[in-house]
Amino acid sequence: MIRIGQGYDVHKLAYDRDLIIGGVKIPYEKGLLGHSDADVLLHAITDAIIGAIGAGDIGHFFPDTDMVFKDADSAELLAEIWQKVEADGFRLGNLDATIIAEKPKMAPYVEQMKLRIAELLHADSAQVNVKATTTEKLGFTGREEGIASLAVVLLEK
C-alpha cells in the first residue's frame, strides 16, 4: 500500500525567539512565534504524515490550547507521530519539502535539516529532500513577516 500526504504551515517572525527550522537552530535576529517551538518545517512534515495515514491534522494530536505542548520541541512531536506510523507498518518512501522565506538564507542549513529529518524518520537522507525559495519580496514572507513551509510525503506499507 502506498499513501501520500501533504502539509503546510506558517509562523510569524518575532524578536526574542529562537529560529528553529527542520530541527536546526539557525542564528538570526528573529525566531518563529508559536505555541510550541514553531518549527514550521517539522510542522508541515508532521501534518503531511498525519494526512497520509488519514488521521486528521497536527492540531488534533497537539492542540495549541493544551499547555502540555507550550514551547514543545517539534522534533519530539514528529517522533511521537512517526512511532505510531511505524507501529502501523509504514515506512518512508520519500519526503520533499520546501521552506519559503526571504531571510535568512536557508542554503547553509539544508543538509543539517535533511540529516535531522532522516534521523527522526528512521530513513536514509537520500529519501529526504529539503529546499528553500523566496517569494521575490511578495506577500508576508517577502515582507519578512513570517516563514512558510510545504511538505509532501510518500509512505509505503
Swiss-Prot record:
<comment type="subunit">
    <text>Homotrimer.</text>
</comment>
<dbReference type="GO" id="GO:0046872">
    <property type="term" value="F:metal ion binding"/>
</dbReference>
<comment type="function">
    <text>Involved in the biosynthesis of isopentenyl diphosphate (IPP) and dimethylallyl diphosphate (DMAPP), two major building blocks of isoprenoid compounds. Catalyzes the conversion of 4-diphosphocytidyl-2-C-methyl-D-erythritol 2-phosphate (CDP-ME2P) to 2-C-methyl-D-erythritol 2,4-cyclodiphosphate (ME-CPP) with a corresponding release of cytidine 5-monophosphate (CMP).</text>
</comment>
<protein>
    <recommendedName>
        <fullName>2-C-methyl-D-erythritol 2,4-cyclodiphosphate synthase</fullName>
        <ecNumber>4.6.1.12</ecNumber>
    </recommendedName>
</protein>
<feature type="binding site">
    <location>
        <position position="9"/>
    </location>
    <ligand>
        <name>a divalent metal cation</name>
    </ligand>
</feature>
<feature type="site" description="Transition state stabilizer">
    <location>
        <position position="134"/>
    </location>
</feature>
<feature type="binding site">
    <location>
        <position position="143"/>
    </location>
    <ligand>
        <name>4-CDP-2-C-methyl-D-erythritol 2-phosphate</name>
    </ligand>
</feature>
<dbReference type="GO" id="GO:0008685">
    <property type="term" value="F:2-C-methyl-D-erythritol 2,4-cyclodiphosphate synthase activity"/>
</dbReference>
<feature type="binding site">
    <location>
        <begin position="57"/>
        <end position="59"/>
    </location>
    <ligand>
        <name>4-CDP-2-C-methyl-D-erythritol 2-phosphate</name>
    </ligand>
</feature>
<feature type="binding site">
    <location>
        <position position="11"/>
    </location>
    <ligand>
        <name>a divalent metal cation</name>
    </ligand>
</feature>
<feature type="site" description="Transition state stabilizer">
    <location>
        <position position="35"/>
    </location>
</feature>
<feature type="binding site">
    <location>
        <position position="43"/>
    </location>
    <ligand>
        <name>a divalent metal cation</name>
    </ligand>
</feature>
<keyword id="KW-0414">Isoprene biosynthesis</keyword>
<feature type="binding site">
    <location>
        <begin position="9"/>
        <end position="11"/>
    </location>
    <ligand>
        <name>4-CDP-2-C-methyl-D-erythritol 2-phosphate</name>
    </ligand>
</feature>
<dbReference type="Pfam" id="PF02542">
    <property type="entry name" value="YgbB"/>
</dbReference>
<feature type="binding site">
    <location>
        <begin position="62"/>
        <end position="66"/>
    </location>
    <ligand>
        <name>4-CDP-2-C-methyl-D-erythritol 2-phosphate</name>
    </ligand>
</feature>
<dbReference type="InterPro" id="IPR003526">
    <property type="entry name" value="MECDP_synthase"/>
</dbReference>
<dbReference type="InterPro" id="IPR020555">
    <property type="entry name" value="MECDP_synthase_CS"/>
</dbReference>
<feature type="binding site">
    <location>
        <begin position="101"/>
        <end position="107"/>
    </location>
    <ligand>
        <name>4-CDP-2-C-methyl-D-erythritol 2-phosphate</name>
    </ligand>
</feature>
<dbReference type="GO" id="GO:0016114">
    <property type="term" value="P:terpenoid biosynthetic process"/>
</dbReference>
<feature type="binding site">
    <location>
        <begin position="133"/>
        <end position="136"/>
    </location>
    <ligand>
        <name>4-CDP-2-C-methyl-D-erythritol 2-phosphate</name>
    </ligand>
</feature>
<feature type="binding site">
    <location>
        <position position="140"/>
    </location>
    <ligand>
        <name>4-CDP-2-C-methyl-D-erythritol 2-phosphate</name>
    </ligand>
</feature>
<keyword id="KW-0456">Lyase</keyword>
<feature type="binding site">
    <location>
        <begin position="35"/>
        <end position="36"/>
    </location>
    <ligand>
        <name>4-CDP-2-C-methyl-D-erythritol 2-phosphate</name>
    </ligand>
</feature>
<dbReference type="GO" id="GO:0019288">
    <property type="term" value="P:isopentenyl diphosphate biosynthetic process, methylerythritol 4-phosphate pathway"/>
</dbReference>
<comment type="pathway">
    <text>Isoprenoid biosynthesis; isopentenyl diphosphate biosynthesis via DXP pathway; isopentenyl diphosphate from 1-deoxy-D-xylulose 5-phosphate: step 4/6.</text>
</comment>
<keyword id="KW-0479">Metal-binding</keyword>
<comment type="similarity">
    <text>Belongs to the IspF family.</text>
</comment>
<dbReference type="InterPro" id="IPR036571">
    <property type="entry name" value="MECDP_synthase_sf"/>
</dbReference>
